[in-house]
Amino acid sequence: MMIASKFGIGQQVRHKLLGYLGVVVDVDAEYSLDQPNEDDIASNMTLRSAPWYHVVMEDDEGQPVHTYLAEAQITYELSDEHLDNDSMDELSQSIRNQLQAPRLRN
């Protein structure tokens, strides 16, 4: 069975609840970390069987933070330019450029 993901690598997204801007750096077809705690969002089997995303976001000090989010937790980001989060714009553009022009190996 093929699972389709809504978001792609290099795409900018927003956390639905917290509003943080982030960039997708990897996609898992389903939850793939250790067994979650019962009170964790990942304990929901419906969410665990849907795509999960490795997303880089910035904390309140502007430092990059790696997060692991369910597809239900993020939404599309319509703008490609964010003056207050220009490092996320740069990361997104860098990833997309690398995907479009992969390096050849010898």
Swiss-Prot record:
Localization, UniProt: Cytoplasm
UniProt GO molecular function: DNA binding
Superkingdom assignment: Bacteria
Pfam families linked to this entry: YccV-like
Biased composition range(s): Polar residues: 90-100
SUPFAM superfamilies: YccV-like
Region (Disordered): 80-106
Keyword GTP-binding: no
Stored SMART domains: YccV-like (SM00992)
GO biological process, one term: response to heat
Keyword Iron: no
GO cellular component terms, semicolon-separated: cytoplasm
HAMAP family the record matches: HspQ
Family to which this protein belongs: Belongs to the HspQ family.
Function according to Swiss-Prot or TrEMBL: Involved in the degradation of certain denaturated proteins, including DnaA, during heat shock stress.
Name of the protein in question: Heat shock protein HspQ
Source organism per UniProt: Proteus mirabilis (strain HI4320)
